[in-house]
């Protein structure tokens, strides 16, 4: 009489385990993909959110210097620099200065691309104490635009700012002796295209 092998059905517990593992792996892959995408989207979203809400010590922007004379009161301004995911070195030329309230001051940061190819970054920024953000005003800043550095390039980047005179009128700032301006450079995956140079003559000056 021929031997007969019993029918063995797959273990339902094992099948459930395999299905669960596949689901977990899919979720983990999705989370990693979202995290990678978020890292590149972080700077524009962060800047937009902070400008819109005033969150996290976001500074103000002005086109011109204040019309009033600087006040007698002074405050120390410290400069902080950080890099996240870029082959750059990034340092302030001065770590700390003292400025009068309402005085326009230009500070410089130095950045070097240590990679063997061009890279692009953009800086996120804030000031602390966070409540000072509404008084700390920038007229010009490298953080307003993307920065593309050639291989080995070093660049000096200015930031022109002042502390609004209304800072001194707010009693909550009486104890504030030091303001820290902090920048963190993040990589830009797809830099904005540079405009092509125009071949049309400059109508303001005519042909030279």
UniProtKB/Swiss-Prot annotation:
Gene3D superfamilies for the chain: Ctag/Cox11
Periplasmic side: 43-208
GO MF entries: copper ion binding
Transmembrane segment boundaries: 20-42
Keywords of this entry: Cell inner membrane, Cell membrane, Copper, Membrane, Signal-anchor, Transmembrane, Transmembrane helix
Membrane topology per record: Single-pass type II membrane protein
Cytoplasmic compartment segments: 1-19
Any one GO biological process: respiratory chain complex IV assembly
Cellular component aspect of the GO annotation: plasma membrane
Subcellular location: Cell inner membrane
PANTHER family registered for this protein in UniProt: CYTOCHROME C OXIDASE ASSEMBLY PROTEIN COX11, MITOCHONDRIAL-RELATED, CYTOCHROME C OXIDASE ASSEMBLY PROTEIN COX11-RELATED
Record family assignment: Belongs to the COX11/CtaG family.
Classification via HAMAP family: CtaG
Functional note: Exerts its effect at some terminal stage of cytochrome c oxidase synthesis, probably by being involved in the insertion of the copper B into subunit I.
NCBIfam families tied to this protein: PRK05089.1
Protein name: Cytochrome c oxidase assembly protein CtaG
Source organism per UniProt: Rhodopseudomonas palustris (strain HaA2)
Gene: ctaG
């Amino acid at each position: 009489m021929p031997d007969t092998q019993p029918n063995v059905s797959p273990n339902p517990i094992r099948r459930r385990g395999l299905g669960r593992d596949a689901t977990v792996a899919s979720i983990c892959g999705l989370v990693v993909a979202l995290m990678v995408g978020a890292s590149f989207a972080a700077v524009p979203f962060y800047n937009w959110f902070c400008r819109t809400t005033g969150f996290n010590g976001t500074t103000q922007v002005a086109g011109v210097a204040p019309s009033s004379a600087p006040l007698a009161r002074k405050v120390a301004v410290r400069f902080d620099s950080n890099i996240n995911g870029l082959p750059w070195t990034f340092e302030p030329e001065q770590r700390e200065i003292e400025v009068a309230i309402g005085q326009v001051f230009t500070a410089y940061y130095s950045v070097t691309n240590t990679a063997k190819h061009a890279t692009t970054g953009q800086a996120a920024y804030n000031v602390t104490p966070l409540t000072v953000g509404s008084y700390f005003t920038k007229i010009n800043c490298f953080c307003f635009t993307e920065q593309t550095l050639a291989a080995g390039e070093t660049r000096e980047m200015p930031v022109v700012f002042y502390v609004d005179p209304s800072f001194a009128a707010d009693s909550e700032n009486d104890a504030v002796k030091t303001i820290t301006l902090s920048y963190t450079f993040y990589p830009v995956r797809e830099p904005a295209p540079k405009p092509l140079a125009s071949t049309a003559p400059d109508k303001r000056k005519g042909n030279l």
